Amino acid sequence: SWLALMVPYSFLFFLIDSLVLWRVVNWYNAEVRYVDILPIRGSSYILSILNEQVGKGAMALYLNRRNGVPGWEVGSSMLFIMFCEFYYLLTWASVGYALQGDSLPDVFSVIPKVAVGAALVFIVFRLFFRGTLFPNSTVRDKPVFHAFRQARTWHFGMIILLRSPALLSAVWVYTVALSYFGVEVGNMQMLGYLPIIFFGAATPGPMRTVAITLWVVLFPGYEGQMTAFGFVQHNFFIFFNAAIGLVFLNRANRELFGQSEQQSGSEA
């Protein structure tokens, strides 16, 4: 059934999302066990209902207090994850456009240009943080850029690879889920559409406006089914992830605020 499809997918996304956080923190901040990342990554989904960046801020605070990682440095790791997430979404959106660009609204024709521009920005970005470009600049030495100074070029690609199973599994899940709403679509067709929708919805501007309603545009004649599909898929994913967070909330609070109280007591 639909729930039997969505529940395992949500857990898989949570585990992959936690893996990315664990990998980045261990690269740039401190040695942390994967199982110790799960409580804060899960709990942060509750705050992400309001705003994704608030959730990342909570993770930064947790790692700062629990592992003693300097605030600016762990904040830098959160920025690194956000930076890689943009390139991850853009990479797969480019694949999607290559597969189904002819059937997409004209607003998405900008994706190849965005991809080329982003590639050039990445090259300049890497040259700057390696000290090749503007070698006398002190901007790169600021704590907020700690992760970017430490990063190797392959780290960026590794994060994209680690995240990709989440998107590929989403393609299959959405393909099957759509059939429950009476609409049949192939996996390759969904691979063309879904990354575009994810990228567009995460990007401010005209693409976001169109992406939110793209299901209806892509499947004319099924307006009611597609409106329901987009609404149900999006909201189930957000709220079930928050429910996962509730499982870990007590432990996260205990490790975060309990440790803070112990520190206050020792200072007194």
Where are the predicted features?
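Extended non-transmembrane interhelical loops and adjacent amphipathic helices
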Residues: 38-68
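Predominantly cytoplasmic-facing regulatory/coupling regions of multi-pass membrane proteins
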Residues: 1-42, 98-202, 221-268
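Short gly/ser-rich anion-binding loops that grip negatively charged ligand groups
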Residues: 14, 28, 32, 36, ...
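Membrane-interface alpha-helices at helix entry/exit sites of multi-pass transporters
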Residues: 34-37, 56-57, 68-83, 222-232
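Membrane-embedded alpha-helical segments of transport systems
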Residues: 43-51, 73-97, 231-243
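Transmembrane helix boundary and interhelical junction motifs in multipass membrane proteins
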Residues: 15-20, 50-60, 188-189, 198-215
